[in-house]
Design a protein with these regions (language model features):
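Phosphate-moiety recognition in structured ligand-binding domains
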Residues: 2-41, 48-53, 179-183, 305-306, ...
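Generic alpha-helical structural element
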Residues: 29, 33, 40-43, 85, ...
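Active-site phosphate/pyrophosphate-binding segments
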Residues: 42-43, 54-71, 76-77, 179-307, ...
């Protein structure tokens, strides 16, 4: 069993502790409190340490994870895994499902992703009675009405249903329901991932990491290497917050995030973060680089930031660079920035290059430092707009845990 190196563990703790006593996002803790941003800032900054904790929790439960999954695989030739969740929890599946289909044997296990809001509203589109299914529920609180209803509907419609519950709140209804259920594997996340702020930050990244570790066939040595690398890359992004602040200081009113494959799901989450934290004061959009030309490019004016999550895949990256060059050549957007693991060749667009070591990562692991960049853009933009990141909805009509949902009974 492979653990993270002591060097990585100690450096992560030191980096976080040093920043806690000084400044985050160029502001002292007291200033952040006055701006209503201290909780969210802390929860963004602590993520590399949380990834370390999430990995250690996974290792401590590895025997139970392997026993649970092997027991299911022995019973069935083909298993369907459905990732589900509401809001940001939905985007966990969008971020990881493609990768898991690439690295697993599709003759025996297949991955799909659908938001619990869709699963509840259109259950027959996604659930089949005669297909053995593992429903993987992602939830920060475990109390969202749609997440709870999705489980009950799946139980009602699927003959052989198993569950993996990945949640941040041990007292949440999903976690409580999983206790003592031999067909439901409960994987609680680090206590610090149960974000106290409005926005899901550490909860999103920790649940993503845990699901990757659980369902990837990679060796434990590979897992440890990849986790060590994302911790280092994530910390480096935080250390370069001045770059992000200079970007946010530009004159913009719109932001578009672009990404292909798992980065498309990440772009969905990134645009939601800035939309939430600025309470809509900044207009947002997400698209794929190839899809952007088919109408959504109309979104760009001279007060638009375009941020692209570039792929490590050489084939896909060609399309990333083509789009960057096209938008840069148009000369309309305020700024075009590409995030990449190594320097992008063949483009004059601005390029935020991760620290050394990212070039060898599968794309799905680049999503971890990339999302820290996007979260940083979001909190800085909220502060710039004079909105309160910790409680961003001035009217109170948008809540940390969704309210007002009526779940209607399903009649078979």
């Amino acid at each position: 069993m492979t653990l993270l190196s002591e060097q990585v563990i100690n450096k992560t703790k030191t980096d976080y502790n040093q920043r806690q006593g000084e400044v985050m996002f160029r502001l002292a803790k007291e200033e952040l409190e006055k701006l209503g941003a201290s909780i969210t800032a802390k929860e963004i900054f602590q993520q590399p340490g949380l990834w370390q904790e999430a990995y250690q929790l996974y290792v401590s439960q590895l025997e139970a994870v392997e026993s649970f999954l092997s027991g299911i695989k022995e019973k069935h030739d083909l298993i369907q895994v459905i990732f589900t969740g509401a809001g940001t929890s939905d985007f966990v599946g969008q971020r990881i499902a493609n990768y898991l289909n690439q690295v697993n044997d599709l003759k025996h296990i297949r991955f799909s992703t659908v938001g619990s809001v869709e699963l509840v509203g259109r259950p027959y589109d996604y659930l089949q009675a005669d297909i053995p299914t593992i429903l993987v529920s992602f939830a920060r609180s475990g109390n969202s009405p749609e997440s709870l209803a999705a489980v009950e509907i799946a139980k009602q419609l699927v003959d052989e249903l198993y569950q993996v519950t990945i949640t941040c709140a041990p007292e949440g209804k999903l976690a409580v329901a999983a206790e003592g259920d031999t067909d439901n594997l409960l994987l609680l996340q680090p206590a610090g991932s149960n974000d106290k702020g409005f926005a899901m930050t550490g909860s999103f990244s920790c649940m993503s990491l845990t699901a990757l570790l659980v369902f990837s066939p990679a060796s434990q040595e590979e897992n440890a290497h990849w986790v060590e690398t994302i911790i280092r890359l994530g910390q480096d992004v935080l250390d370069r917050e001045d770059y992000v602040q200079d970007l946010v200081n530009l004159d913009f009113e719109r932001v578009i995030y672009l990404g292909a494959g798992g980065f498309y799901g990440l772009a969905h989450e990134a645009q939601l973060k800035i939309l939430e934290l600025t309470a809509g004061k900044i207009a947002t959009m997400y698209e794929s680089p190839l899809g952007f030309r088919h109408g959504p490019k109309s979104f760009i004016n001279n007060k638009t930031l375009v941020i692209l999550f570039a792929s490590n895949d050489a084939y896909t990256r060609q399309y990333d660079v083509d789009l960057l060059n096209e938008v840069h050549g148009d000369g309309i957007a305020e700024r075009i920035v590409a995030l990449s693991a190594d320097k992008l060749a063949g483009t004059e667009a601005a390029n935020f290059v991760l620290a050394e070591g990212g070039a060898g990562l599968p794309d799905v692991f680049l999503t971890f430092p990339y999302i820290i960049f996007a979260q940083t853009v979001s909190i800085m933009s909220a502060i710039k707009c004079k909105n309160l990141p910790d409680t961003p909805s001035p009217t109170g009509t948008v809540n940390r845990v969704v309210q007002g949902v009526i779940i209607h009974p399903l009649e078979k």
